[in-house]
């Protein structure tokens, strides 16, 4: 997938992406991901 920092830049807020556990610990794999800003668009959350 495209990495947004290459052309678009980062936006607040960050979102949490949770993936199913890849092991038998039963723990969700959650990571903070930046929302991607499209060039020329301004979003005021």
Curated annotation (Swiss-Prot):
<dbReference type="GO" id="GO:0044564">
    <property type="term" value="P:envenomation resulting in occlusion of the pore of voltage-gated potassium channel in another organism"/>
</dbReference>
<keyword id="KW-1015">Disulfide bond</keyword>
<keyword id="KW-1220">Voltage-gated potassium channel impairing toxin</keyword>
<feature type="disulfide bond">
    <location>
        <begin position="18"/>
        <end position="37"/>
    </location>
</feature>
<comment type="subunit">
    <text>Monomer.</text>
</comment>
<keyword id="KW-0632">Potassium channel impairing toxin</keyword>
<dbReference type="Pfam" id="PF00819">
    <property type="entry name" value="Myotoxins"/>
</dbReference>
<feature type="disulfide bond">
    <location>
        <begin position="11"/>
        <end position="30"/>
    </location>
</feature>
<keyword id="KW-0800">Toxin</keyword>
<keyword id="KW-0964">Secreted</keyword>
<dbReference type="GO" id="GO:0090729">
    <property type="term" value="F:toxin activity"/>
</dbReference>
<dbReference type="InterPro" id="IPR023355">
    <property type="entry name" value="Myo_ane_neurotoxin_sf"/>
</dbReference>
<keyword id="KW-0872">Ion channel impairing toxin</keyword>
<keyword id="KW-0929">Antimicrobial</keyword>
<comment type="similarity">
    <text>Belongs to the crotamine-myotoxin family.</text>
</comment>
<comment type="function">
    <text>Cationic peptide that possesses multiple functions. It acts as a cell-penetrating peptide (CPP), and as a potent voltage-gated potassium channel (Kv) inhibitor. It exhibits antimicrobial activities, hind limb paralysis, and severe muscle necrosis by a non-enzymatic mechanism.</text>
</comment>
<dbReference type="InterPro" id="IPR000881">
    <property type="entry name" value="Myotoxin"/>
</dbReference>
<keyword id="KW-0959">Myotoxin</keyword>
<keyword id="KW-0528">Neurotoxin</keyword>
<protein>
    <recommendedName>
        <fullName>Myotoxin-2</fullName>
    </recommendedName>
</protein>
<dbReference type="GO" id="GO:0005576">
    <property type="term" value="C:extracellular region"/>
</dbReference>
<feature type="disulfide bond">
    <location>
        <begin position="4"/>
        <end position="36"/>
    </location>
</feature>
<dbReference type="GO" id="GO:0015459">
    <property type="term" value="F:potassium channel regulator activity"/>
</dbReference>
């Amino acid at each position: 997938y495209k990495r947004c920092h290459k052309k678009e830049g980062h936006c607040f807020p960050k979102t949490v992406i949770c993936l199913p556990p890849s092991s038998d610990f039963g723990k969700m794999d959650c990571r903070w991901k930046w929302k991607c800003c499209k060039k020329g668009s301004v979003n005021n959350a």
